[in-house]
């Protein structure tokens, strides 16, 4: 009951309270006499889909940054908005950001291949993976979500002194590209309580790893290790990819006859990876839906692009999904994060598919 009350308050509280502001940054003063961007039917569906679970569902209109739904379930404290206030490992959903970045650097190409036989060994360390054919190229590595491929690709990027003579420069450039896609910092949503996640840079790794190299931090390649994101950031990343490289600050207010959305919220942010790299990423996300980890959301009426994640956790793993639809002229980007939900393909992915179908097809 507390969860239901919280999500209802998320929709109506902005009308009941005089002014919200993000006090720490002092960025926004949000008046209350303007309508919300939330789609009531979508919000209701997302609420029902998360019933009895702990986690969040977020949907964004990629063309505007408007929040279409934002649901947070918390079994312990319903006052915490997990969509913007909780930082998690993104798991394999992070591989799409890796792909766009490493492609633009020239560290990989669409033809790059790595072997995987239920994982791989390096320096006595085993990276596990599920069974699939081997070797894989880039599009297949996204579609099949191969852990071995992404760890080897990231390791080789970090250790490639021909590409980057100084490893710190390599990691700092990587960090900058991730930041340009809205990762590792708060996005500036017009709600209080947003946290920024974590994308490590060279200074952070120097402090925490003491003599790091590609092998010791290769976990970052598959979205594990120190990387942390919020569900809102994952949804925004899906919007970045849907737009082939740009995004708008996610926001929950829209214009009315008496109030205009803060111009800060309508600025178009351009990410650093190339448009061509995003097209290849989208091809991989389509492969995931056609014959990879996202087959549960194939739809005969429109083309869906998706990426699953299974985020390692001390207890049961978290189930993660992010995606958008349609492939051309996208209307909705979605992220789903279910704590202790297991495989992303089994739970978060089908939930995300239902959210997209409701918005596009109205059912």
Language-model features, listed with the residues they occupy:
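Conserved, well-ordered alpha-helix/loop/beta-strand core segments that scaffold catalytic motifs
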Residues: 26-55
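Beta-lactam-recognizing serine transpeptidase/beta-lactamase-like catalytic domain environment
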Residues: 24, 33, 55-56, 61-88, ...
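Generic structural signal for hydrophobic residues
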Residues: 42, 98, 173-174, 355
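Short, gly/Ser/Thr-rich active-site loops of penicillin-recognizing serine hydrolases
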Residues: 262-269, 351-363
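Bacterial N-terminal signal peptides
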Residues: 7-19
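Positively charged n-region of N-terminal signal peptides that target proteins for export
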Residues: 1-7
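Active/ligand-binding-proximal structured segments within catalytic/core domains
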Residues: 91-100
């Amino acid at each position: 009951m507390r969860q239901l009350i919280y999500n209802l308050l998320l929709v109506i509280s902005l009308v009941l309270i005089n002014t919200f502001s993000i006090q720490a940054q002092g960025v926004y003063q949000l008046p209350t006499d303007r309508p919300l961007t939330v789609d009531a039917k979508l919000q209701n569906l997302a609420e029902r889909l998360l019933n009895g679970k702990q986690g969040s569902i977020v949907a964004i209109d990629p063309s505007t940054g408007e929040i279409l739904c934002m649901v947070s379930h918390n079994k312990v404290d319903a006052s915490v908005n997990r969509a913007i206030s909780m930082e998690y490992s993104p798991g394999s959903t992070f591989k799409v950001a890796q792909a766009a970045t490493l492609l633009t650097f020239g560290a990989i190409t669409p033809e790059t291949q790595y072997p995987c036989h239920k994982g791989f060994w390096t320096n006595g360390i085993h990276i596990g993976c599920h069974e699939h054919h081997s070797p894989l190229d880039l599009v297949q590595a996204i579609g099949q979500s191969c852990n071995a491929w992404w760890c080897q690709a990231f390791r080789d990027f970090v250790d490639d002194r021909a590409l980057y003579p100084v490893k710190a420069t390599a990691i700092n450039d990587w960090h900058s590209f991730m930041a340009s896609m809205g990762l590792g910092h708060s996005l500036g949503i017009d709600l209080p309580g947003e946290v920024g996640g974590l994308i490590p840079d060279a200074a952070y790794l120097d402090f925490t790893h003491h003599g790091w190299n590609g092998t010791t931090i290769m976990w970052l390649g598959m979205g594990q290790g120190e990387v942390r994101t919020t569900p809102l950031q994952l949804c925004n990343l899906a919007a970045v990819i849907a737009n082939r490289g740009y995004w708008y600050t996610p926001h929950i207010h829209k214009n009315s006859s008496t109030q205009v959305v803060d111009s800060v919220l309508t600025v178009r942010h351009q990410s650093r990876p190339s448009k061509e790299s995003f097209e290849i990423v989208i091809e991989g996300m389509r492969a995931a839906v056609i014959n990879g980890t996202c087959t549960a959301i194939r739809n005969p009426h429109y083309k869906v692009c998706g990426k699953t994640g299974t985020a390692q956790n001390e207890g049961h793993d978290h189930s993660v999904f992010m995606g958008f639809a349609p492939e051309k002229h996208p209307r909705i980007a979605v992220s789903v994060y279910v704590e202790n939900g297991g495989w992303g393909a089994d739970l978060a992915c089908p939930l995300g598919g239902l959210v997209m179908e409701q918005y596009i097809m109205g059912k």
